[in-house]
Amino acid sequence: MFSVLSYGRLVARAVLGGLSQTDPRAGGGGGGDYGLVTAGCGFGKDFRKGLLKKGACYGDDACFVARHRSADVLGVADGVGGWRDYGVDPSQFSGTLMRTCERLVKEGRFVPSNPIGILTTSYCELLQNKVPLLGSSTACIVVLDRTSHRLHTANLGDSGFLVVRGGEVVHRSDEQQHYFNTPFQLSIAPPEAEGVVLSDSPDAADSTSFDVQLGDIILTATDGLFDNMPDYMILQELKKLKNSNYESIQQTARSIAEQAHELAYDPNYMSPFAQFACDNGLNVRGGKPDDITVLLSIVAEYTD
């Protein structure tokens, strides 16, 4: 039914709903290094029981979680399904993009304060492949700098992230759309289609930087989540996260992905996507069947 991606077991002394949420001593000014405890879950849109792709891919979505001595880095990407009409597997582009980002981080070929640089270098490597890799993808990269306790993000398109503190959203990504249901995207097209296929530069990604605190919750996901679950539903699920151990985070990530997957196939549900469609003059109701990828992280004290 689902596949779970995990990374890291950190010493997490901040307990959700306790010190990290209410006590000023839990603020971002502590002297120790920070890290992320991350778990993930996802569904492919065309999921059938027992059929799962290997690796961190759910349908045309892809993701990665990587650790370096200077930072924890994670990302999600949503391959554009329209390429399938031209005989191209959309998951190849998104999957290769995320694997390249992961490798760059593990090799230390990045600057924590510049997540756009990770996207740019990865995209350039794809462009320089001897064997052409056609396709398009959105992308969202999140970097936690261990020593500065700052989160640096880059978001291109309609994947994105939320940062939750004290039960409220304190930071979130901005969705980037050219027009309805047409997000910003990185693309590689055949020569004859260059200038015709929609393609954005990594530099077009929305970039933010801000301090985080111990116990902050970071949810990074593709649009399959956000198109089917409004913030209030996500926050309701996050309230069930009572502590910051890995098993609890994994269970909550799974619960969020499962609920989004169920809502995606409810024809009577007025989903955020359906509401957005109505706002654009379309008579639409129901969830939006789509690939869903959820990475759920908690900021914790880091131990190597």
Curated annotation (Swiss-Prot):
Query: Residue ranges of the PPM-type phosphatase domain?
Result: 69-299
Per the entry, induction is: By hydrogen peroxide and nutrional stress (such as low glucose). Up-regulated during lymphocyte activation.
Q: Which InterPro entries match?
A: PPM-type-like_dom_sf, PPM-type_phosphatase-like_dom, PPTC7
**GO biological process: what's one of them?**
positive regulation of ubiquinone biosynthetic process
| Keyword terms | Hydrolase, Magnesium, Manganese, Metal-binding, Mitochondrion, Protein phosphatase, Transit peptide
Q: What SMART domains does its record include?
A: PP2C_SIG, PP2Cc
Positions binding Mn(2+) 2 in this chain are D78, D223
Which major enzyme category is it?
hydrolase
Q: What are the required cofactors?
A: Mg(2+); Mn(2+)
Q: What is catalyzed by this enzyme?
A: O-phospho-L-seryl-[protein] + H2O = L-seryl-[protein] + phosphate; O-phospho-L-threonyl-[protein] + H2O = L-threonyl-[protein] + phosphate
Q: Which residues bind Mn(2+) 1?
A: D78, G79
- Gene Ontology cellular component terms for the protein in this record: mitochondrial matrix; mitochondrial outer membrane; mitochondrion
**Where does this one sit in the cell?**
Mitochondrion matrix
Q: What is its main location?
A: mitochondrion
- Tissue specificity statement from the Swiss-Prot or TrEMBL entry: Expressed in keratinocytes (at protein level).
* Inhibition and activation profile: Inhibited by sodium orthovanadate.
Q: Which residues belong to the transit peptide? A: 1-68
Co-factor note (free text): Binds 2 magnesium or manganese ions per subunit.
UniProt GO molecular function? metal ion binding; protein serine/threonine phosphatase activity; protein-macromolecule adaptor activity
**What are the EC numbers?**
3.1.3.16
Spell out the subunit comment: Interacts with FBXL4, BNIP3 and NIX; these interactions are important for ubiquitination and degradation of BNIP3 and NIX.
- What does the protein in this record do? Protein phosphatase that plays an essential role in mitochondrial metabolism and biogenesis. Positively regulates biosynthesis of the ubiquinone, coenzyme Q. Dephosphorylates the ubiquinone biosynthesis protein COQ7 which is likely to lead to its activation. Serves as a crucial sensor for mitophagy, though the underlying mechanism remains ambiguous. May dephosphorylate BNIP3 and NIX and thereby directly regulates mitophagy receptor function and stability.
Protein family per UniProt = Belongs to the PP2C family.
The name of this protein is: Protein phosphatase PTC7 homolog
Q: Record the organism.
A: Homo sapiens
Q: Which gene encodes it?
A: PPTC7
